[in-house]
Amino acid sequence: MRLSMDEIVNAICIHMAERKQVRPTDVLVELCWDEENGFTAEVTIQGRLQYLVEANMLEAIERYMFSEYNRRVYRDQIHLDVEDEMWADIHD
């Protein structure tokens, strides 16, 4: 299974909204990748900027997979990749 960039953003929005007790629409996410830091996300909630590392992103995807697809997946089953856009491959 493959999650699109939009689904990764949705996963992070839902995850951070639950953690910060705001609506998912109040969360802005920008996905990033560079050779030095790997996969990261810039999250803005109520004017405050927070950076998520890959482990945080994987946690959000794990929770998203369970809540949206009723599938329990673990971090070693999720592989993030990027070309023109970022995606996540979910392996069984």
Model-derived regions: residue spans:
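Protein-protein interaction and targeting regions used for scaffolding, dimerization, and localization
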Residues: 1-92
